[in-house]
């Protein structure tokens, strides 16, 4: 069962586990889980992953994201911007601006 290892890997490093003070569940049902993520200026969230889903920016900001292979990219995030994430994609995120807030809408199963 190839999918089992990926799901376990993603769950072990899920953002709710590595950043419990920054990430909180604001809605959950059988289909989706919505997580509100708040990052302080210069805050760094260690290597983590999300389930497959969308991220919605509640305000503008600037972040640096580094994937599990060391590739680093800087993003200027716009208020209202949507982005897609595949399940198991791991990354470190560093907030390069002021307080940053987003909603992570994760699909289950």
What are these regions (language model features)?
Residues 1-36, 44-47, 73-78, 82-86, ...:
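A short, N-terminal "cap"/entry segment at the start of jelly-roll beta-barrel domains
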Residues 50-69:
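Glycine- and acidic-residue-biased ligand/ion/polar-headgroup-sensing regions
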Residues 92-96:
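Asparagine-centered strand-capping/turn motif at beta-strand->loop junctions
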Residues 39-42, 51-52:
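Short coil/turn motif common to extracellular beta-sandwich-like domains
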Residues 48-50, 91:
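Histidine-centered divalent metal-coordination motifs
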